[in-house]
C-alpha cells in the first residue's frame, strides 16, 4: 500500500499506541548489560516511528522528522550527525531521476512512446493486453507509476470503446494489466520506486556497499520480467478464446518536436552513463563519477538548454512543484534511524537476540519473510514496510551468514508485489477509481499473482545463493 489515507479507526489507536510504547522506555531499564543507554533510547525512537509509519497515524513524511528532534536530545549524537543521512547521495539520485521524469512528461515523450507501441501491435485482444502491459512496465521504470497509470487509463478506455470487443471481461483485464505493469516496472530500476532508492542508500550508509544502477538492474530487471510475464499469462488466460481480431484506431503520430528530441537525447545519454559507469570511471577525470552525479548532471542541463520557445529552457523552476519533496524527508528519516541503530550498538543487540533463528533453515526463514511482506504490503505502505523491516532483516542475514544485500533485495522487491487490493498500490487505486473494476475482480486475479510472486522470489533466492 502506498497511499497515505487510512481509516480514522486506525489513526487514533496508532498514535496513542506509539506514544505509550515510547513513554514506557523511560520507566523501564534495559535488562541487558550489552545494551547501552544510547541504544535503549534509539530502540524507543524506532518503536515510535515504526508504529506511526505502519499505522500512518500522521503523515509518514512528518514521522521521518522524528530522528532530527529526538535523537540529539536522547542520545550522544549531535544534530549534525543525525542530519547527515538526509543528504545521502541516493537522495540526489532520486531527485535527478525524478526531474528527468518531469521533463519527459512535460514534452509528452511518454505518450509518444505509448502510441508508437500501440500503432505497431497485433490485432488480437491478447496482443493489445501485452502491448499495454509492456508500455506500463517500461514507462514506470523512469516515471512514477501513478503517472503511468493515469496516462494509460484514458488511452485504454478509448481502445476498448473502439474495438467493441465481444468479451465483456476484456476492459477489466486490460485495466488490471496496466496497474500490474506499472507496479512491476518500478522494481526493475533503482529510480523506479521508493523502496529501491531507500535500500541502495541504506546499504551505502551502513555497510559501505554501493549498488550501481547496472548492478541493481542486473538482478531486478530479469526478475521483474519474469513477474511481468506471469502477470500477463494470468490475465490472458481469462480472455475469451473465441474473441475476434480487432484493429486499434490510434492517433496519428506527428513529427517529433525539437523539445522532445532534446529531452530524448538527454534521457538516452543518462541511461547510457548509468549502464556504462564502470567504464567511464576508468577515465581519470571521471574516476569519482556516481549514479547520483549522473542524475544531477542530467537535471542541470534540463534547466539550461533552451526550449523551442527561445525565452524559456526545457525546464523551469516552477515545474518543480511536481517533485515529491516528502519522499526526500522519508528517505532521510529512514537512513538516519538506520544509522543510529548501527552506531548505538542496537544492531548488535538485536542480532544477538536473533541467534535462535540459526537453528532454522535459510529457505524456511526467507519463505516466511516473503509471504509476510507480500501480504502485509497489501494493507501497509511498501516504503514504510521497507523502512521498518530492513534493519531487522539485515541482522537476520548476518546471523545466518547470508549476504545482507541479497536478502535485502528480496525484501524490497517483495514489498512491491502487491496486486490484490485497490489500496495496495497507487496504480491499483487509479484503475479502481475508474469505476470499471470491482474489488472482487482485482482480488481474484491479484491473489494468484501474489502466490506466483512468492514462488518466483524464492526461486530467485535459491538461484542467488547457489
Predicted ranges, named:
Residues 1-93, 215-352, 448-454, 458-466:
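Hydrophobic transmembrane alpha-helices of multi-pass small-molecule transporters
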Residues 31, 48, 61-62, 66-168, ...:
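Membrane-embedded alpha-helical segments and adjacent helix-loop junctions characteristic
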Residues 70, 200-208, 436-439:
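Interfacial segments of multi-pass membrane proteins
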Residues 94, 125-139, 165-185, 211-219, ...:
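Alpha-helical transmembrane segments of multi-pass membrane proteins
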Residues 148-153, 157, 172-200, 220-246:
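Transmembrane-helix bundle segments that line or gate the permeation/cavity pathway
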Residues 205-212, 394-406, 465-466:
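Helix-coil boundary and interhelical linker segments in multi-pass alpha-helical membrane proteins
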Residues 433-452:
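Interfacial loop-to-transmembrane junctions
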Amino acid at each position: 500500500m502506498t497511499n497515505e489515507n487510512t481509516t480514522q479507526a486506525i489513526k487514533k489507536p496508532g498514535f496513542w499506541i506509539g506514544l505509550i510504547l515510547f513513554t514506557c522506555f523511560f520507566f523501564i531499564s534495559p535488562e541487558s548489560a550489552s545494551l547501552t543507554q544510547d541504544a535503549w533510547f534509539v530502540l524507543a525512537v524506532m518503536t515510535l516511528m515504526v508504529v506511526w509509519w505502519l499505522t500512518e497515524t500522521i503523515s509518514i513524511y512528518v514521522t521521518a522528522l522524528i530522528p532530527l528532534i529526538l535523537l540529539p536530545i536522547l542520545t550522544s549524537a549531535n544534530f549534525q550527525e543525525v542530519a547527515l543521512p538526509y543528504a545521502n547521495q541516493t537522495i540526489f539520485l532520486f531527485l535527478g531521476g525524478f526531474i528527468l521524469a518531469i521533463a519527459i512528461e512535460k514534452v509528452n515523450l511518454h505518450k509518444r512512446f505509448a502510441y508508437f507501441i500501440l500503432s505497431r501491435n497485433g490485432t488480437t485482444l491478447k496482443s493489445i493486453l501485452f502491448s499495454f502491459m509492456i508500455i506500463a512496465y517500461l514507462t514506470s521504470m523512469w516515471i512514477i507509476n501513478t503517472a503511468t497509470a493515469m496516462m494509460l487509463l484514458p488511452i485504454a478506455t478509448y481502445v476498448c470503446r473502439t474495438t467493441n470487443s465481444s468479451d465483456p471481461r476484456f476492459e477489466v483485464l486490460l485495466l488490471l494489466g496496466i496497474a500490474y505493469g506499472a507496479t512491476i516496472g518500478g522494481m526493475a530500476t533503482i529510480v523506479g520506486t521508493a523502496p529501491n532508492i531507500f535500500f541502495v542508500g541504506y546499504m551505502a550508509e551502513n555497510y559501505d556497499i554501493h549498488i550501481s544502477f547496472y548492478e541493481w538492474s542486473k538482478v531486478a530487471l530479469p526478475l521483474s520480467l519474469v513477474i511481468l510475464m506471469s502477470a500477463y499469462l494470468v490475465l490472458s488466460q481469462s480472455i475469451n478464446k473465441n474473441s475476434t481480431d480487432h484493429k486499434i484506431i490510434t492517433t496519428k503520430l506527428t513529427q517529433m518536436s525539437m523539445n522532445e528530441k532534446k529531452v530524448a537525447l538527454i534521457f538516452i545519454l543518462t541511461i547510457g552513463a548509468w549502464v556504462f559507469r564502470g567504464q567511464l570511471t576508468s577515465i581519470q577525470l571521471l574516476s569519482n563519477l556516481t549514479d547520483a552525479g549522473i542524475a544531477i548532471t542530467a537535471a542541470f542541463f534540463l534547466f539550461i538548454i533552451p526550449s523551442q520557445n527561445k525565452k524559456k529552457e526545457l525546464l523551469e523552476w516552477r515545474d518543480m512543484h511536481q517533485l515529491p519533496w516528502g519522499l526526500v524527508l522519508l528517505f532521510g528519516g529512514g537512513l538516519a534511524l538506520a544509522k543510529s541503530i548501527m552506531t548505538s550498538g542496537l544492531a548488535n543487540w538485536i542480532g544477538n537476540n536473533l541467534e535462535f533463528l540459526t537453528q532454522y533453515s535459510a529457505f524456511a526463514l526467507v519463505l516466511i519473510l516473503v509471504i509476510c511482506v507480500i501480504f502485509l504490503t497489501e494493507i501497509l505502505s511498501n516504503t514504510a514496510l521497507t523502512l521498518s523491516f530492513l534493519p531487522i532483516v539485515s541482522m537476520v542475514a548476518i546471523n545466518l551468514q547470508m549476504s545482507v544485500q541479497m536478502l535485502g533485495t528480496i525484501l524490497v522487491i517483495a514489498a512491491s508485489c502487491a496486486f490484490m487490493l485497490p489500496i495496495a498500490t497507487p496504480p491499483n487505486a487509479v484503475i479502481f477509481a475508474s469505476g470499471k473494476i470491482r474489488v472482487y475482480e482485482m482480488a481474484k486475479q491479484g491473489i494468484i499473482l501474489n502466490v506466483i510472486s512468492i514462488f518466483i522470489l524464492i526461486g530467485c533466492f535459491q538461484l542467488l545463493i547457489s
